[in-house]
From Swiss-Prot:
GO biological process: carbohydrate transport; glycerophosphodiester transmembrane transport
Top-rank taxon: Bacteria
Catalytic activity: sn-glycerol 3-phosphate(out) + ATP + H2O = sn-glycerol 3-phosphate(in) + ADP + phosphate + H(+)
Record membrane topology: Peripheral membrane protein
Listed name of the protein: sn-glycerol-3-phosphate import ATP-binding protein UgpC
Location of the ABC transporter domain: 4-235
Keywords associated with the record: ATP-binding, Cell inner membrane, Cell membrane, Membrane, Nucleotide-binding, Sugar transport, Translocase, Transport
SUPFAM superfamilies: MOP-like, P-loop containing nucleoside triphosphate hydrolases
Residue sites binding ATP per the record: 37-44
Coiled coil: none
Gene name linked to the record: ugpC
GO cellular component: ATP-binding cassette (ABC) transporter complex, substrate-binding subunit-containing
Keyword Acyltransferase: no
Family membership noted in the UniProt record: Belongs to the ABC transporter superfamily. sn-glycerol-3-phosphate importer (TC 3.A.1.1.3) family.
Amino acid sequence: MAGLKLQAVTKSWDGKTQVIKPLTLDVADGEFIVMVGPSGCGKSTLLRMVAGLERVTTGDIWIDRKRVTEMEPKDRGIAMVFQNYALYPHMSVEENMAWGLKIRGMGKQQIAERVKEAARILELDGLLKRRPRELSGGQRQRVAMGRAIVREPAVFLFDEPLSNLDAKLRVQMRLELQQLHRRLKTTSLYVTHDQVEAMTLAQRVMVMNGGVAEQIGTPVEVYEKPASLFVASFIGSPAMNLLAGRVNNEGTHFELDGGITLLLNGGYRQYAGRKMTLGIRPEHIALSSRAEGGVPLVMDTLEILGADNLAHGRWGEQKLVVRLAHQERPTAGSTLWLHLPENQLHLFDGETGQRV
C-alpha cells in the first residue's frame, strides 16, 4: 500500500488567478478520501494534477513516498476510473481489462492471472467474452474498475464514476465500491458533486469551494461540526437552516433579522452585540407548544416524503425547514410551535462565515 501527499499545491492558468489555492493534504496508506463540491470548485482539476494530466503551478505531490510532481502519468503508479467508462467497443471485457498490461509488455500468463482475479472480485467471470454493448451500465463500470485493478496501482483515482448511472444503480455501485475498498485496501482519491456518495463512501471528506479546501474531516465531523457557512449549506439534505441576526448586548438572546428572538441560555457573552448566522438542521428542530415557550412558525408548504415530512415556513424573510415524523401532517397555514435545542445550534461569524 502507499500514501498520497499534496504539499501546498496550487494551479493557475494565466499566472495570476489561482484556481487551486495553496492546498495541503495527507492521505494515509489505504485511506479512501472523497473530494466533494459544486461544479467549478476545482476538485477535478486537483485530481488531474495528481494524475499528471495537469501540471502543478507550485507545490509538490508525493505518491508512495516518491516525489512525482514532474513525472509522466504512466510513471506515477496510479490508475483512473472515469465517468464515461472509456472502454474499447471492439474488444471483449477480457481484452479491455488486459489491454493496459499488454501494451506495457507484461507476459501473457501474468496478464491472464490478474484479469482472472479482478473478474472474480468484481463478479465478471461469466462476462469476459462479451463486448461493452452487451453490458448494462453497472457492468461497464465494473469493467472499467477491473481495468484499473489489474494494474495494481499505488493509488486509485475516481473521477465521478457513478454519474452516468441511474439512481437505483448508483446505490448498488456505492455498496460495491465500499466492499471493493475493504478487500483491496488501496489508497483512493474520489471526486464527486454528490454529497450522498461523499458521505457514504469516504473515510474522510474534503469539501471544496472556489479552489479552497473548506473542511477536511470524517463524514460525521463534517455533518455535525461544519467549519463554515458553505459546508453547513452544502452538506445535508435538506440543507442546514441558516438564520442571519445578532447576539443581543447581554448575550442571552439571538435576534433574527425579522423580529423573532431566540433564547440563549449561556456561553454566548463573548459574542454579545455581534452579527452572526445561527444554524440548525431541520431534523434537530423539535415540536413544542405555546405554553412551553415554543416559537411560532406559520407553515407554507408540506412535502410528504414517505419516511418523514418537511414543513416549510418563514421567519420574516428567512426560510425555515423542519423535518417531521411521518405521522405529522399539518396543513398549509397552520402554526407550528417549535423548540430549537441549544446543544444543536451552530454559530457562524457574520463577516468571515467561519464557525465560532
